[in-house]
Amino acid sequence: GKSVDLGGRRIIKKKNKSYMKKFLKEFNIPTSQYAILDSFDNTALNNFHYPLVVKPVDCNSSKGVKKVFTEMELHVALESAILYSRTNTAIVEEFKEGEEISADFYVEKGIAKFLCATNSAKMRNTHSFTILQSRYPAIGDEQKGELLRIAQQIVDAFHLENTPLLVQLILKDNHFDVLEFSTRMGGGSKYKLIEVLSGVNIMSSYVDLILGESPRMAPWEKVKYAVMNYIYCYPGIINSFEGFKNLLDNSFIEEYFLYKTEGMEITKAETSGDRAAGYLVVASTEQELQEKVSYIDSQLAILNNNGVDIMCHGLSDLVL
């Protein structure tokens, strides 16, 4: 990754988890025990307890990220993560039970402003980390205050001035542990989710920032309940997306996103890079949200060349 000057300490290789973890520990920002490995080394993991999480140190999307329960599984996952990593190293850390929270901030003149936080709902009982939904609301007011405190710790430690800031954390028993952070907005369709939840057009503000202007943020809570549902498919070649525009035109969905295009081949449904599409739903109550999602799922289809629906339906029933 490139060095980026953010008005103070130079942040090198923002996607480099080794560098990031080192600084989290140095500045006493809560995070899990970890080790950086370029090959299997049991002595480095003496005090670790299974299950463990293995990640490439420097890699896009969630490729190579695995949860392992045994030494044999660790060997396989480590070899894969090292291959995926640009640095040929992997990070191994203890798996933290709890809710995964994705929190977006905008740093304005060295002060972190809270935009929104969502719960990254994953598929149950799997070794991979397949995110099925980003759910809102995810936290209460007290937890929002704690998130702001952690974000400001990161801002102060790195002397950040004007930049988006994404922090991913685990929440358990009202305690946060930082998984990772980066000076960027969330990828894919996250920009739209931020806008719908907070009223902030983060994409436009980021462009203004790059052009030398100083965007001013005034986030507010726009909706009561929302969910971004991610769509995965069974293996096959996509021929057409059915039902999306009709649901948008009839206001069942707020927005939809096609991450794949017609003619592309789907081989698996594991990482964020495997998603075929996504759609955003808002509601006034949790029950209304669930009813909308159930109806939408029944109306959508992704057809292959033979007219067979290869969309994985009912995924919202499989979340943790």
Describe these PLM feature segments:
Residues 16-91, 97, 108-110, 133, ...:
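Active-site nucleotide/adenylate-binding loops and adjacent lid/helix of ATP-dependent enzymes
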Residues 66, 94, 195, 276-284:
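Short, well-ordered beta-strand elements within core beta-sheets of diverse protein domains
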